[in-house]
From Swiss-Prot:
It comes from Chlamydia trachomatis serovar D (strain ATCC VR-885 / DSM 19411 / UW-3/Cx). This is Large cysteine-rich periplasmic protein OmcB. Its main location: periplasm. GO terms for cellular component: periplasmic space. The keyword Signal applies. Residues 1-22 form the signal peptide. It is found in: Periplasm.
Length: 547
């Protein structure tokens, strides 16, 4: 066991010296000296053992055959392992450098060789991961002559052999064998290095989107009756279609509820096999042929179109609504709804639906069903040429522009017939500006101060504009200072505030004037308020007792 440990330590020491030599830290002479000292020291330790163990070791050593020897002997010990009959070098031993990240490299050399006879150096590189541009460099022994190599290469001027492997996959091995011939006795140091670039591979799946569009619609329709088209879009390709957009111009003679002339639908991305359906509804305004064209486009692809032609027939039902263009808030307004059948067919199950805007209250609608802001009349039949008229009385609680929408739906041999109409009324509010004047201290002593506070409030439902305030005081009171939402000016016993541009509904502002009592008496303060709503200025008087 001691013998095995000794030889393992010796091999490790010699290998370390070889590594230092390959890295350039040691010169040739120094490396040879260190190697010789290591081997001599190992022999000296062996001789210090007991004579019995020494004799037994020598006896075992003389009887040991080269083939059965398992431990690695020092490089200079030619008797450690005998060569084969046709070779002049010993058994190969391996030195491994493990680079867990990229490439693992091992180098195998004989335990000993004979001067003048070639011996091999075997280098094996194993890929730890996929690498490219793998470069293996072999430093030739200094006192040896290059014979050949497999793969073949030519030594450089500084005695190096270089091989390049374009790609070495994970788990793949590449073996190199170099034959050199030692020129003199001693230790032949050799070293191999490897340099590799890790390779990262990525895959991009390429496909081709193919957007197809089809459209469905009626062959015939009635004037002023809804015409519905279904646009079907499907991606029949193998890749995602990006930024899919469908454009549908409103055909000539049609109207859309949005008021737009081109309808645009942004579908975003569509996966392969994905299907989308868009429904568009138009109201025909004139008879004749109308063609609806839908065009689909997507990023990097060609535009595709689909069209349907519809023949618009005579109208079946008509509706109109009339009412005031404007009115004051809380004042009732009457709308008149007229429904007629100008066609040749009997209309059945006629439904007249009047929908009012939020904020509008229905006061009266004879013969109708009222539900919140919706009024509905029903008629079993409406003969050709017949007309009906309905009235609805409403009132708005707040100012604003409100639209009254009427839709008539009916059935006929021409199919479902619908007509719609609307009327818009602007409901105006009324401003109601009021003023209140109080003094904070009453009575006051001569030389003391009192404050007049003037509160101006708009109690109405509309804003008031250009609100102006002026205050006049008797000789017993002298204005000292003022405050308010606008600037003011003191002239003698009069204070004038600049006009307030607007006073909103239910809004209150406050003005104040600080006055000094200069003489005893029953003083008076008059506030005069004017605005665009107040055609005649409003005045309010407050008295203050001074003693």
């Amino acid at each position: 066991m001691n013998k095995l440990i000794r030889r393992a330590v010796t091999i490790f020491a010699v290998t370390s010296v070889a590594s230092l030599f390959a890295s350039g830290v040691l010169e040739t002479s120094m490396a040879e000296s260190l190697s010789t000292n290591v081997i001599s020291l190992a022999d000296t330790k062996a001789k210090d053992n007991t004579s019995h163990k020494s004799k037994k070791a020598r006896k075992n050593h003389s009887k040991e055959t080269p083939v059965d020897r398992k431990e690695v002997a020092p490089v200079h010990e030619s008797k450690a392992t005998g060569p084969k009959q046709d070779s002049c070098f010993g058994r190969m031993y391996t030195v491994k450098v493990n680079d867990d990240r990229n490439v693992e490299i091992t180098q195998a050399v004989p335990e000993y060789a004979t001067v003048g006879s070639p011996y091999p150096i075997e280098i094996t590189a194993t890929g730890k991961r996929d690498c490219v541009d793998v470069i293996i460099t072999q430093q030739l022994p200094c006192e040896a002559e290059f014979v050949r190599s497999d793969p073949a290469t030519t030594p450089t001027a500084d005695g190096k052999l270089v091989w390049k492997i374009d790609r070495l996959g994970q788990g793949e091995k590449s073996k190199i064998t170099v034959w050199v011939k030692p020129l003199k006795e001693g230790c032949c140091f050799t070293a191999a290095t490897v340099c590799a670039c890790p390779e990262i591979r990525s895959v991009t799946k390429c496909g081709q989107p193919a957007i197809c569009v089809k459209q469905e619609g009626p062959e015939n329709a009635c004037l002023r009756c809804p015409v519905v088209y279904k646009i079907n879009i499907v991606n029949q390709g193998t890749a995602t279609a990006r930024n899919v957009v469908v454009e549908n111009p409103v055909p000539d003679g049609y109207a859309h509820s949005s008021g737009q002339r081109v309808l645009t639908f942004t579908l975003g991305d569509m996966q392969p096999g994905e299907h989308r359906t868009i429904t568009v509804e138009f109201c025909p305004l004139k008879r004749g042929r109308a063609t609806n064209i839908a065009t689909v486009s997507y990023c990097g692809g060609h535009k595709n179109t689909a069209s349907v032609t519809t023949v618009i027939n005579e109208p079946c039902v008509q509706v109109s609504i009339a009412g005031a263009d404007w009115s004051y808030v809380c004042k009732p307004v009457e709308y008149v709804i007229s429904v007629s059948n100008p066609g040749d067919l009997v209309l059945r199950d006629v439904v007249v639906e009047d929908t009012l805007s939020p904020g509008v209250t229905v006061l009266e609608a004879a013969g109708a069903q009222i539900s919140c802001n919706k009024v509905v009349w029903t008629v079993k039949e409406l003969n050709p040429g017949e007309s009906l008229q309905y009235k609805v009385l409403v009132r708005a609680q707040t100012p604003g522009q409100f639209t009254n929408n009427v839709v008539v739906k009916s059935c006929s041999d021409c199919g479902t017939c619908t007509s719609c109409a609307e009327a818009t009324t602007y409901w105006k509010g009324v401003a109601a500006t009021h003023m209140c004047v109080v003094d904070t201290c009453d009575p006051v002593c001569v030389g003391e101060n009192t404050v007049y506070r003037i509160c101006v409030t708009n109690r109405g439902s509309a804003e008031d504009t250009n609100v102006s305030l002026m205050l006049k005081f008797s000789k017993e009171l002298q204005p000292v200072s003022f405050s308010g939402p606008t600037k003011g000016t003191i002239t003698g016993n009069t204070v004038v505030f600049d006009s307030l541009p607007r006073l909103g509904s239910k809004e209150t502002v406050e003005f104040s004037v600080t006055l000094k009592a200069v003489s005893a008496g029953d003083a008076r303060g008059e506030a005069i308020l004017s605005s665009d709503t107040l055609t005649v200025p409003v005045s309010d008087t407050e008295n203050t007792h001074i003693y």
